[in-house]
Amino acid sequence: MQPTDVKNPDYFHKVVDCQWACPAHTPVPEYIRLIAAGRYSDAYMVNWESNVFPGILGRTCDRPCEPACRRSRVEEENNPKPEPVAICRLKRVAADYKDDIRGRLPKKGKSNGKKIACVGAGPASLTVARDLAPLGYQVTIFDQDPRAGGMIWSQIPRFRLPLEVIDEEVGYILDIGVEFKGGVKIDSMKKLMTEGYDALFIGSGAPRGRDLDLPGRKEGAKNIHIGIDWLSSVSFGHTSKIGKRVIVLGGGNTAMDCCRTSKRLGGEDVKVIVRSGFEEMKASPWEKEDAQHEGIPILNYLVPKKFVVESGKLTGMVFEKVKAVHENGRRDLVPTGEPDQHFDCDDVLVAVGQENAFPWIERDAGIAFDKSNMPVVDKVTMQSSAPNVFFGGDAAFGPKNIIWAVAHGHDAAVSIDKLLNGEDIAERPAPGVSLMSQKMGIHEWSYDNEIHADMRYKVPWRDIKITLKNVKAEVELGFDVATAWKEAQRCLNCDVQTVFTDRLCIECDACVDICPMDCITFTGNADEKELRNHLNAPAKNLTQDLYVSGPLKTGRVMVKDEDVCLHCGLCAERCPTGAWDMQKFLLEMTNAGPGCRSHRQKKAA
């Protein structure tokens, strides 16, 4: 193998598994260290710079960082149920215990004369506004709802996300000088294009829930509701009750929100019915656990066949029992041949997916759409076929989640800023990277001189007798300070990297002897496949890179499997020549502003 290019910003970034997995690339170990030190406001600001909504995401994020967490991998053989660090809930700690941080937020920049319109007031549009307003852009956000936040406030129940948390963090953005026009529905793209805006950002979400065209649908329409519309109606205060017997159709997070909300609005016999298996459900594992904790059964492998309507009233549903069959590399659901199953109900909530809807974008407005009736959008720049029109969030590529919408907003803001400064938006400067040597001995970066197989600490819940009676009573109470400190110490500080200097190595193999995970090997060079199988501990995880040195004095190379390294620093402490060094990796993502335009400025200079 060729020596590893550690100057490539992606190399050490990828080693910080949580940050690499986060669409907004939040520096997770950095803010966890700040929480452990009691510096909650600093931890909040580290989050705010990258993910914009720490308090909101600390309660609702889909947590792509946690399945990637190294803690789970290194404990697989020592712990019956290895669990990642509670990254998401520690984010909430920063939000819960911060001081007043308004003085640390950016102010509206001096006007540069450029106007930006954002359609939809969800997380993608708000991120665009957050990034551009301090640069002097006049940003106006339009939304048909009277309150900013989009699906954050209209579709996520208050028992998961209190309104005051939304208002606080949305308010931080609007207070930068962003104009919000609530209750204004944009019904013509061509008209908007004539209103003097230099760039348009479309963050209108995926506002249409999928329906089920089954026998009995029209006859029982009064008691058959589209899930996201029903949740919005609850948020608006238009809906405050539901029948005692409720069936929720669907296996995603919206279905989990629907069933739990139903339980609080009068539903006594509430069940979720899904066509797939339990493990294949799209809902996050913790969302399913939360529903089951509240006594809501999830019934799998049942395909809806018809709504049962008697004397004009919905009375139940009929389902066909299916099973999963794997043939020729495909997975299909086939009938089992068992009798159909009937379930009584008073109401049905249909939460089987969401779709985009762009009836307001005329097809002769210069914006290309694909065969699926989705806008053609560049996945890097977020630009449509109309040069000054950008898309993000669910409006760009279909339903995803809040943290992806934030990432899209950052990318679109960079593109808008470059476009309106006369630059090629496809030229994206690489992130800034710095590596700083850390003190040895009593570590600056680790919490303990030993790595313990510590179990994940559980977030306390409010008494279920209270929460099931009040749709606004927040269920999770968040970590207290003491528990947050203990959970923070489970972090392995993967951003403190093991950096190897070939010329200093005397090949004493002391680092090999002391490594607790056997992830360092000195061996003859070979291709990657052969090296992976001939290390002290075979490197079987192909998603994790090998760190390979240049040729050493004996002709051998140092090979380190990044997969299970604990970042404990023992190799660096033991090395007599300083060939190993522990260096803290800091990644600065390229955001809108002078940094994203630096390439052109340097060439001009």
Regions found by a protein language model. Name each.
Residues 1-9, 78-115, 138, 152-153, ...:
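Flanking helices and flexible, charged tails adjoining ferredoxin-like Fe-S electron-transfer domains
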Residues 12-37, 58-92, 140, 144-147, ...:
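Iron-sulfur cluster-binding cysteine motifs and their immediate structural context
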Residues 20, 24-107, 172-174, 182, ...:
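Glycine/serine-rich phosphate-binding loop and adjoining beta1-alpha1 elements at the start
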Residues 25-37, 44-47, 77-84, 88, ...:
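Beta1-alpha1 glycine-rich phosphate/pyrophosphate-binding loop at the start
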Residues 93-110, 168-183, 188, 209-265, ...:
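Glycine-rich dinucleotide-binding loop and its adjacent helix/turn
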Residues 110, 115-119, 167-214, 306-318, ...:
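Feature captures the FAD/FMN-dependent oxidoreductase FAD-binding
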Residues 221-243, 327-399:
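FAD-site-proximal beta/loop scaffold in flavoenzymes
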Residues 258, 395-422:
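A conserved FAD-binding loop/helix module that cradles the flavin
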